[in-house]
Amino acid sequence: MRARPLATLVTSGDKGLNANHIPVQTLNEPAPLGSIRGHIARANPLWRDYAQGSEALAIFQGPHIYISPSLYPSKAQTGEVVPTWDYAVVHARGVMRFIDDPEWLRSFVTGLTAAHEASRAQPWKIDDAPREYIDKMLRLIVGFEFSILSLTGKWKVSQNRPLADQQGVVQGLQGASDADSHEIAAMLAARGR
C-alpha cells in the first residue's frame, strides 16, 4: 500500500457507486490496522455524496503482468496451455470522515509532499510557493481519513501451475525489462522456496 499509494476508492451514496483514483498516505495509527489519509478536489461530489458511516473500499493495485503460455515448459509436452494474468492487490475496507480544516489540510499536504519529494536531489517544499497561493489551493480541496476495518490481500502468481511451469514463468519474467515482471517473478520464486 505504501509502495503503490494510488488507491482506487470505491464508495456508495445516493447516486450509487462512485470510484475515484486518489494518491494517499497509509498510517499505522490507529491500531490495529491503521488508516489512510488523502484529499480530493472540493468540486469532487464524493465528499457530499458519501453516506456517512457506510463502508468504503480502497483498492491498491500491486504488480501485474500478462503471462504467455510460451513460458510454460508443458506447452511443448501437451499443448494444453492458455494465457493468463498474474497480479497482486490489497483491498482495504473501512469508513471515512471528511475534513474541511485548513490547518489539517496544510499539515497533511506538507507531509505528503515531503514523503514524495524525499528521494529528489532538490526536493520541493510547500514553503517554496507563496503562502497566499498555497492558501488559495487549500481552499480548493477537502481532506479525508479512512479508518481501516479489514485488509485482504489477493494474488495470483501462477501458483496453480506445475512446478516446472512456475519455474518457466520465473525465468521468463526475470528476463523482462519491466519492474512488474520482476516483482511477480520474485513473488513466485519466494513462494516456491
Question: For each predicted feature, which ranges?
Answer:
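Binding-site signature for planar aromatic cofactors or substrates
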Residues: M1-R193
